[in-house]
Design a protein with these regions (language model features):
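Pyridoxal 5′-phosphate
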Residues: 1-416
Length: 416
């Protein structure tokens, strides 16, 4: 059920115990590292505790009441995930440890069965290492080639370059692209890219780790073939990821991990695999945290993803106006908030990002500094690292003001 009007952020903040913390002695926590992970509401914490306190059991196996209750709650989360991204069926939803494992599953299972020598896989310069390294491993193993779509100086992908790769006589075997950059905040026009790719018969993987938590994502409308994302970036626990795969593709893919629960029958020299999606979920899964993820989805649904996006746009516009007025600051990525999410990466003068993050921490402000697992993009930007502030539903304009005040103090301290 969607709330009416703008988000009541101060009411939302009451649901997050950690936001009552203080850093550096007496400084209220200003948490601006949401692109790395988000904080957890009480509903999620309580759902996990409830499992361990009241119906802790393995799933899909025993017939006793605890097992049946645990299985029911686990599978309820799969249903919630399918509805959240508008998947056709729960059979299209595979639980993994994280988005990284989800992309590796595609590379290992689909990739090793389909990619051949001299084939090409197309990715982009904005990718997280999770959407680079698996393809490097695969192309190296298969004698295939990895191609990169570049970005312009404003952080937009060069779509003509992308089109050229698709039109080349050496046809690409697969495209894998982030829906939203974890550094630039760029929202990639994946709908258009998927359509262009499908016109050439090329399947597309979408890394939705930064988009699914922040906006309404509809995999059927988007028509992607694969999508990966993580629970912990959308109020859920760590250790849970999701891989969505179109069923007609998933049915042809070999298993990723062998073991219990992904089988129907095992004999000395042969095995009959389980039905979808269990064929890809070998071993005891992260039951408690999958159940906690279900509570996180309920929480976001109660707010409404359109409201989440509206709040972040408003906050990002406010922050961009403030930060671009600070002397010596360079902001990376699009300045039009229609084209970017709630992520602002920046540098200020010659202050090292780690030094800046330390000063921020002294003011109670938690930001990220470093290469953000995107060293290919850092090379494109010609920097070793950046500082990054990223927003979510519980952040306020007052917190942005604290962040900017700390930034101004750093500027004065370093005489910029």
């Amino acid at each position: 059920m969607m709330q009416k009007g703008a988000l009541n952020v101060h009411k939302i903040r009451e649901d997050f115990p950690i936001l009552k913390r203080k850093l550096s002695g007496d400084k209220p926590l200003v948490y601006l590292d949401n692109a790395a992970t988000t904080q957890k509401p009480l509903a999620v914490i309580n759902a996990i505790s409830d499992y361990y306190m009241n119906y802790n059991s393995n799933i899909h196996r025993a017939v006793h009441q605890l097992a049946e209750e645990a299985t029911l709650e686990f599978e309820k989360t799969r249903e919630k995930v399918a509805k959240f991204i508008n998947a056709k069926s729960t059979e299209d939803i595979i639980f993994t440890r994280n988005a990284t494992e989800a992309i590796n599953l595609v590379a290992y299972s689909w990739g090793r069965a389909n990619v051949k020598k001299d084939d090409r896989i197309v990715i982009t310069e904005i990718e997280h290492h999770s959407n680079i390294v698996p393809w490097q491993i695969l192309t190296s193993e298969k004698g295939a080639k990895l191609e990169y779509v570049g970005t312009d100086d404003d952080g937009y992908l060069k779509l003509q370059e992308y089109k050229n790769y698709l039109d080349s006589s050496m046809k690409a075997k697969l495209v894998s692209v982030s829906h939203m950059s974890n550094v630039l905040g760029t929202i990639v026009p994946v709908d258009d890219m998927i359509k262009m790719s499908h016109e050439k018969g090329i399947p597309v993987v979408i890394d939705g780790a930064q988009s699914v938590p922040h906006m309404h994502v509809d995999v059927q409308r988007m028509d992607c073939d694969f999508m990966a994302f993580s629970a912990h970036k959308m109020l859920g626990p760590t250790g849970v990821g999701v891989l969505y795969v179109k069923q007609e593709i998933l049915e042809k893919m070999p298993p990723f991990i062998g073991g219990g629960d992904m089988i129907k029958e095992v004999h000395k020299y042969e095995t009959r695999y389980n039905d979808l999606p269990y064929k890809f979920e070998g071993g005891t899964p992260n039951i408690a945290d999958v159940i906690g993820f279900g509570a996180a989805i309920d929480y976001l649904n109660n707010i409404g993803m359109d409201k989440v996006r509206e709040h972040e746009v408003e906050l990002t516009e406010y922050a961009l106006d403030k930060i671009t007025a600070v002397k010596g600051v360079t902001v990376y990525g699009p300045h039009n908030t229609k084209d970017r999410g709630g992520v602002i990466s920046f540098n200020i003068g010659d202050i090292h990002p780690h030094d800046l993050a330390t000063i921020m921490n002294d003011h109670g402000v938690a930001i990220r500094s470093g290469h953000h697992c995107a060293q290919v993009l850092m090379e494109r930007l010609d920097v070793a690292a950046t500082s990054r502030a990223s927003f979510y539903i519980y952040n306020t304009k007052e917190e942005v003001d604290v962040f900017i005040s700390a930034l101004e103090e750093a500027r004065r301290l370093f005489k910029i």
